[in-house]
C-alpha cells in the first residue's frame, strides 16, 4: 500500500481488506521503487493524474488506483453504487445531485462517469470557481442554485470542502459557503423523503454539511465506510484471482 498523499480512512480500509482476505499487507514509503517490490498487488494513491496508469505499465503487480490527483477514485465509486443498491435503489432513472468542489474532486468525476453510465440523471451545483469549465460535457445538468440541484433528488453526494481552497480565494469564506451551498435540514426537505445522503469523508460539519444532516436517518455516510472494506475485499479478490472459483466463496 503506497500513499504519496495521506488518507487515514482509505488506508485503514485497504489494510483491513487485505487482512480479512488472509493476506499480508505492508505500507511502504514512496522512496521504494515499483520495480523492486515483490508483491502481488499495489494499492497506490498519488497526487498526479495518470500515476496509476503509468505504474501499471512499468510494474508487474496488479495496480489498484486509490486515487490519482483529481482524476479518479474507482473504489469509492464502487462502494457508493453498492451503498445505493443496498438500499434497494436501481440507479437507472434516479436523480443524483453532486454538490460542492467538483473541480478538484476525483470522487465527483468517478461518480459522474459511473452514474451516467448506469442511466442516472446527474445534477451538480457549487461555486463557479469550483466547477470544471467543461462540466456540461460530462453529461450532467449544471445549476447555479443548490436548491434546484437537490429538488426531488434520490441521492445527494456532498463533497468535502478543503479549506485551502478558501485561502486561494475560490470562495469568500466558510460561513458564506455554508450559507449558499451547505446542505442543512431545510434544504434536505427539498429532496425525496427517502433520499440517500452520501459523503466521501471526512465531513466538515457546519460547512458543506450540517451536523443534523450528517447524522440523520437518510445519511448513509457511516455505511459507506463499512461498505468500503467489503468492496475493497471484493476488488482485491477479483484482481488477484481473476474471478476464478468465485462460486466457492460464501
Model-derived segments and spans:
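Adenosine-phosphate binding glycine-rich loop
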Residues: 194-250
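Glycine-rich phosphate/diphosphate-binding loop of Rossmann-like nucleotide-binding domains
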Residues: 86-159
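Short, structured coil segments at secondary-structure junctions
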Residues: 58-60, 118, 136-139, 193, ...
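Low-acidity, Ser/Thr- and Arg-rich intrinsically disordered low-complexity segments
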Residues: 2-27
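Phosphate/diphosphate ligand-binding glycine-rich loop within oxidoreductases
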Residues: 20-23, 28-82, 205
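Rossmann-like adenosine-cofactor binding region
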Residues: 135-211
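Short, acidic/turn-prone active-site loops that include or flank metal/cofactor-
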Residues: 67-72, 127-129, 224-228
Amino acid at each position: 500500500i503506497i500513499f504519496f498523499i495521506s488518507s487515514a480512512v482509505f488506508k485503514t480500509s485497504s489494510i483491513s481488506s487485505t487482512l480479512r482476505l488472509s493476506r499480508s499487507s505492508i505500507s511502504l514509503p514512496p522512496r521504494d521503487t515499483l520495480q523492486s517490490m515483490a508483491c502481488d498487488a499495489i494499492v497506490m494513491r498519488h497526487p498526479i493524474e495518470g500515476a496509476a496508469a503509468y505504474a501499471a505499465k512499468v510494474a508487474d503487480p496488479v495496480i489498484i488506483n486509490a486515487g490519482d490527483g483529481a482524476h479518479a477514485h474507482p473504489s469509492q465509486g464502487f462502494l457508493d453504487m453498492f451503498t445505493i443498491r443496498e438500499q434497494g435503489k436501481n440507479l437507472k432513472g434516479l436523480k443524483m445531485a453532486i454538490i460542492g468542489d467538483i473541480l478538484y474532486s476525483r470522487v465527483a468525476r468517478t461518480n459522474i462517469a459511473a452514474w451516467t453510465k448506469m442511466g442516472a440523471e446527474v445534477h451538480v451545483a457549487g461555486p463557479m470557481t469550483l466547477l470544471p469549465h467543461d462540466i456540461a460535457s460530462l453529461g450532467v445538468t449544471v445549476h447555479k442554485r443548490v436548491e434546484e440541484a437537490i429538488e426531488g433528488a434520490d441521492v445527494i453526494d456532498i463533497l468535502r470542502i478543503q479549506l485551502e481552497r478558501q485561502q486561494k480565494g475560490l470562495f469568500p469564506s466558510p460561513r458564506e459557503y455554508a450559507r449558499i451551498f451547505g446542505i442543512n435540514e431545510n434544504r434536505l426537505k427539498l429532496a425525496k423523503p427517502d433520499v440517500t445522503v452520501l459523503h466521501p469523508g471526512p465531513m466538515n460539519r457546519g460547512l458543506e454539511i450540517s451536523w443534523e444532516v450528517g447524522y440523520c436517518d437518510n445519511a448513509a455516510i457511516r455505511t459507506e465506510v463499512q461498505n468500503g472494506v467489503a468492496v475493497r475485499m471484493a476488488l482485491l479478490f477479483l484482481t488477484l484471482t481473476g474471478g476464478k472459483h468465485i462460486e466457492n466463496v460464501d
